[in-house]
């Protein structure tokens, strides 16, 4: 009897004579609030976001690291373009040679378009060559260093090209019409032979070095690099765990010397003569001859041609290019110091193991052990 009663009770519980099944309860819970009302509530919630909250979110985004980094990169690209277009390229084919891949790109552009009336084409093609030369280095950077670093670097190079082609064709402010210091291309070289006109070359180099140094410092702060040899040096610096700043500087100096030597070798008689006596030297041949120079309708010749080539190579163009690199490096150190002094205190009961580990990874700085006092 007891078993039968328990079965009846169980059956009663399972039958649920109330007429409300579990499925109907679930459906009623879901359908209790219609979908239209739920959608209206979501819409009202979204509408409650005030304009003040939107502004606060926008300000928070402006302060975010991503926005700051790309702001650095954009401004750096503009300064880099201004440094080259308005100060380096403005010194014409026989002026300042930038360092790194930029020196190679400028050397090729100058070799193909050497005349002063081809300055705009020469400058534009410099940026094209500079971008193309960095493509294989960009691929190297993606493989060996990382996509984030390499992508930001190629963005920097692309923005420089964009700024150049945007400003090159704007009236009044393009580099052919706007001169921040003097119109170097129009200087009367003949009346200043061996004189003060060369001082302007060093002024242009110093200003270009400052602008380019600021650009490099900002692009480093933005988590990118200036491309070119920076990709290779960044890889070996991380791999070998050593500072390669000195090697980088030496390579840049070598590139300047090599490109200037090639340019000097390729100079024709008329081109070399125009460097020292101006582009209208042919109208002043008699005056130049009275000064004792060997010159004819083709330009300087014989020993004067050779001596002036040597003089050109070891002249203002070389030292102005070095000045550009030095000023650029000093400015970079001010904006983005390579070395920051910090003291680290490690409190440990395993001092021997810590010291051995630091020595194993060739930690370059001093390690001072202070015994604990009771």
Curated annotation (Swiss-Prot):
Pfam families: YitT_membrane (PF02588)
Region (Disordered): 1-46
Assigned keywords, A-Z: Cell membrane, Membrane, Transmembrane, Transmembrane helix
Basic and acidic residues bias spans: 25-46
Coiled-coil region: none
Membrane topology: Multi-pass membrane protein
Compartments where located: Cell membrane
GO CC entries: plasma membrane
Presence of keyword ATP-binding: no
Residue spans crossing the bilayer: 70-90, 127-147, 153-173, 199-219, 242-262, 312-332
Family of the protein in this entry: To M.genitalium MG432 and MG443.
UniProt-listed PANTHER family: UPF0750 MEMBRANE PROTEIN YITT (PTHR33545:SF5), UPF0750 MEMBRANE PROTEIN YITT-RELATED (PTHR33545)
Protein name: Uncharacterized protein in fibril gene 3'region
């Amino acid at each position: 009897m007891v078993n039968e009663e328990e079965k009846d009770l169980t059956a009663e519980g399972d039958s649920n004579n109330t007429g409300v099944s579990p499925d109907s309860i679930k459906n009623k819970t879901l359908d209790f609030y219609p979908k239209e009302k739920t959608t209206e509530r979501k819409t009202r919630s979204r509408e409650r976001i005030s304009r003040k909250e939107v502004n606060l979110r926008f300000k928070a985004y402006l302060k975010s690291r991503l926005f700051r980094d790309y702001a650095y990169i954009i401004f750096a690209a503009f300064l880099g373009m201004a440094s080259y277009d308005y100060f380096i390229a403005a010194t014409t084919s026989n002026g300042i040679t930038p360092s790194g891949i930029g020196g190679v790109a400028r050397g090729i552009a100058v070799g193909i378009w050497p005349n002063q009336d081809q300055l705009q084409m020469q400058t534009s093609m410099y940026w094209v060559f500079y971008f193309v030369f960095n493509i294989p280095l960009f691929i190297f950077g993606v493989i060996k260093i990382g996509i984030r670093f390499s992508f930001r670097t190629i963005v920097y190079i692309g923005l420089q090209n964009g700024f150049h082609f945007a400003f090159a064709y704007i009236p009044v402010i393009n580099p052919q019409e706007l001169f921040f210091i003097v119109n170097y291309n129009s200087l009367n070289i003949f009346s200043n032979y061996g004189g003060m006109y060369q001082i302007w070359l060093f002024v242009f180099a110093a200003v270009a070095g400052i602008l380019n140094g600021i650009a490099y410092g900002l692009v480093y702060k933005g988590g990118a690099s200036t491309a070119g040899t920076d990709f290779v040096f960044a890889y070996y610096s991380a791999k070998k765990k050593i500072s390669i700043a000195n090697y980088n500087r030496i390579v840049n100096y070598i590139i300047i010397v090599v490109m200037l030597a090639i340019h000097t070798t390729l100079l024709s008689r008329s081109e070399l003569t125009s460097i020292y006596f101006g582009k209208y030297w042919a109208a002043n041949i008699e005056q130049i001859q009275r000064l004792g120079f060997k010159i004819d309708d083709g330009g300087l010749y014989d020993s004067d041609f050779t001596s002036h080539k040597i003089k050109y190579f070891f002249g203002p163009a070389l030292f102005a290019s070095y000045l550009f690199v030095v000023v650029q490096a000093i400015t970079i150190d001010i904006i983005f110091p390579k070395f920051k002094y910090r003291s680290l205190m490690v409190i440990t009961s395993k001092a021997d193991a810590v010291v051995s580990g630091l020595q194993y990874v060739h930690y370059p700085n001093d390690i001072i052990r202070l015994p604990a006092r009771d």
